[in-house]
Amino acid sequence: MEFKYSEVVEPSTYYTEGLCEGIDVRKSKFTTLEDRGAIRAHEDWNKHIGPCGEYRGTLGPRFSFISVAVPECIPERLEVISYANEFAFLHDDVTDHVGHDTGEVENDEMMTVFLEAAHTGAIDTSNKVDIRRAGKKRIQSQLFLEMLAIDPECAKTTMKSWARFVEVGSSRQHETRFVELAKYIPYRIMDVGEMFWFGLVTFGLGLHIPDHELELCRELMANAWIAVGLQNDIWSWPKERDAATLHGKDHVVNAIWVLMQEHQTDVDGAMQICRKLIVEYVAKYLEVIEATKNDESISLDLRKYLDAMLYSISGNVVWSLECPRYNPDVSFNKTQLEWMRQGLPSLESCPVLARSPEIDSDESAVSPTADESDSTEDSLGSGSRQDSSLSTGLSLSPVHSNEGKDLQRVDTDHIFFEKAVLEAPYDYIASMPSKGVRDQFIDALNDWLRVPDVKVGKIKDAVRVLHNSSLLLDDFQDNSPLRRGKPSTHNIFGSAQTVNTATYSIIKAIGQIMEFSAGESVQEVMNSIMILFQGQAMDLFWTYNGHVPSEEEYYRMIDQKTGQLFSIATSLLLNAADNEIPRTKIQSCLHRLTRLLGRCFQIRDDYQNLVSADYTKQKGFCEDLDEGKWSLALIHMIHKQRSHMALLNVLSTGRKHGGMTLEQKQFVLDIIEEEKSLDYTRSVMMDLHVQLRAEIGRIEILLDSPNPAMRLLLELLRV
């Protein structure tokens, strides 16, 4: 491993207690950047979430955690990963000092933002909880924006890793009573942060480990993670013992307690056993390093990651022995104390907010402006459905016979069965995995509009029902075989049942909206739904008749079809917003924002259909070509190749036969590539991003309110 940003620490100046024999201690040359990141995270927690008491976390007077555990972190990435690490430490402290159920909620809220999807279930909507949840989401959004600005690919890998960590680790099994080390160790590896650390280090070092090596990575690093987990248990024993006592538990989720039970020994005896095991596992990991250092069958980045873990082992030891987190009598250094008390020196905290993407295209893109027609979402992800109080039309009241006989009550079980039949197609599509973009848009927009959580939840439910209803109809009308990797609903329940349920669900959503909105707001929603159907009609007309729309017609269709659910959500939130919000000032800006967002989303979706391997798994290879759908790339190519007889005929043949062969699709794709239509599409998307950033900036200025969550959503839509 090449060393650019760190230096070896003289061994005579620190202690390791023999727990990292054979491994140097290295320290970053840029450790003040860690100080900035950690202190900034702590300040933001206090500001946006609430007081967190005495400072504790990543910093140390001589050895701060990231500086010695990831000493080769690229300098420009050191502050942001230190911020992330401090945020994780604070979250860990919260889940350690609350009850099990509350800790699960804390973890679920963390995972929700990492996955950009809404977590279903009951949520405490008291002001205190609302502020905490909104504060965490704000911090996480800002954090991801900073990471995306530096390295989008690594940032997205990191987010996935962190979501997995919060899902399966992060104190999820603190109620489990482990009494055998062999059963405890797999849990400890996850809880100590294997996936969190993977995301942090790969981002910090700029590593890209191939997916097919991830399982190998886990196998090769197992000994290191066991060693680090046991190290942490030695130093966190007093903290975790006290937390268990505080909550009246008769066990501690810590190797020291487990060893005490398994070997019938006291704390000192368990400590000795634990230290011996650490030495053994460190030695085993050094053997792995020796065996793999020249193995070219393993990617270079994986070998770098294996090497980096060596310094995580030694750095964890020297930091733990001197840090205030585990050593209450130790203080911070002079600079750290000064920054904590007086605030950080002036420095741009988030350059992404001032940066616009550069457009570099060989061909001038037609820039889709945002002042044409009204704007719906066609294919945003869906969350799980929640029941509403809207009547289904099935009465539980007594029924009179024509002869005026005694009242007969409808059998309740039969009514439940009928409702289950009616809603089964909806429940099927609502159960599919979702990216949660629609809910994320609503949450981000609400950072500006500040609608109470109860009302926001109802708006999300109604928009979710409308969205899933549109998907039921779209898949049937397009004859799509797959939806998110599963058979489309009409291929499970039949076309007639699917259409019937979709129609019912649209009416149900309108009923939900009527329950919490005034008549004028309901009328706006009805108008948007009518516009949505108009856009779908044009899309179907072009497909059926083989008519090639112009780019302007294509943009208008997107505004009518894909922008409308964004528009509906915006309208409902704006009408429910506090009277202090200057509606007249921001309404036109929000109108442009939703239209641009709809265009960005639809053009990106059509583009991904042609090029994305993940999309192929979810929907099939170039499914839009099977359906005869028009994308911007295809429209651009056709208008450049109006006399290409083979191309025109293969498209006509595909429509006639209800789909194309693999070879026919590849033929069309080759022409799209030759005509640089994919490059053109990318340039249009880049221009849309510029316009969206400008629109977000205008609204931020009008409301005097930065919105990192909205900017994060925009970054996640970048190709």
From Swiss-Prot:
Superkingdom as given in the UniProt entry: Eukaryota
Residues the record lists as binding dimethylallyl diphosphate: R483, K561, T562, Q602, N609, K619, K629
Residues reported to bind isopentenyl diphosphate: K435, R438, H467, R484
Residues that coordinate or bind Mg(2+) 3: D474, D478
Keyword terms of this UniProt record: Isoprene biosynthesis, Lyase, Magnesium, Metal-binding, Multifunctional enzyme, Transferase
Any GO BP annotation: isoprenoid biosynthetic process
Binding positions for Mg(2+) 2 per the UniProt entry: D92, D96
Effect seen on changing D474A: Abolishes prenyl transferase activity
EC number: 4.2.3.43, 2.5.1.29
Region (Disordered): 358-404
Disulfide bridges in this chain: none
GO molecular function: geranylgeranyl diphosphate synthase activity; lyase activity; metal ion binding
Region (Fusicocca-2,10(14)-diene synthase): 1-334
Pfam families from the UniProt entry: polyprenyl_synt, Terpene_syn_C_2
Effect of D92A: Abolishes the binding of catalytically essential Mg(2+) ions and inactivates cyclase activity
Catalytic activity: geranylgeranyl diphosphate = fusicocca-2,10(14)-diene + diphosphate; isopentenyl diphosphate + (2E,6E)-farnesyl diphosphate = (2E,6E,10E)-geranylgeranyl diphosphate + diphosphate
Pathway: Mycotoxin biosynthesis
Binding annotation for Mg(2+) 1: D92, D96
InterPro entries: Isoprenoid_synthase_dom_sf, Polyprenyl_synt, Polyprenyl_synt_CS
Region (Geranylgeranyl diphosphate synthase): 335-719
Subunit structure: Hexamer.
Family of the protein in this entry: In the N-terminal section; belongs to the terpene synthase family. In the C-terminal section; belongs to the FPP/GGPP synthase family.
Name assigned to this protein: Fusicoccadiene synthase
Organism: Phomopsis amygdali
